[in-house]
Amino acid sequence: MSITKDQILEAVAAMSVMDVVELVSAMEEKFGVSAAAAVAVAAGPAEVAEEKTEFDVVLKGIGANKVAVIKAVRGATGLGLKEAKDLVESAPAVLKEGVSKDDAEALKKSLEEAGAEVEVK
């Protein structure tokens, strides 16, 4: 009678950490492989899955209430009236770069309430 994978997993789960280390060493010797290579390969794709920490807020469109959007942009960016108006009229335009997710979402919400179309990248 052969042992199933489930039985092997249950046996390994019941072992102490030292027993598992000894088992891995014995398997490395028996099969001529290294467990470190498998760990390095498995760790590679995990870096790609990192969560983004900095976001850009992009004004995609003005909407119907241009004045309210200009006021919201002025409040968020600290620009003067002329600069904020030029920025709004040049949509699509990046309003803020490298901001946190919370700040980006708050800015997006305030601009959307003013009638703008906003994207967080």
From Swiss-Prot:
Lineage of source species: Bacteria, Pseudomonadati, Pseudomonadota, Gammaproteobacteria, Enterobacterales
Gene3D superfamilies in alphabetical order: 3.30.1390.10, Single helix bin
InterPro entries named in the record: Ribosomal_bL12, Ribosomal_bL12_C, Ribosomal_bL12_C/ClpS-like, Ribosomal_bL12_oligo, Ribosomal_bL12_oligo_N_sf
Family: Belongs to the bacterial ribosomal protein bL12 family.
GO BP annotation list: translation
Pfam families xrefs: Ribosomal_L12 (PF00542), Ribosomal_L12_N (PF16320)
SUPFAM superfamilies: ClpS-like, Ribosomal protein L7/12, oligomerisation (N-terminal) domain
GO MF term list: mRNA binding; structural constituent of ribosome
GO CC terms, sorted: cytosolic large ribosomal subunit
Protein name per Swiss-Prot or TrEMBL: Large ribosomal subunit protein bL12
Biological function: Forms part of the ribosomal stalk which helps the ribosome interact with GTP-bound translation factors. Is thus essential for accurate translation.
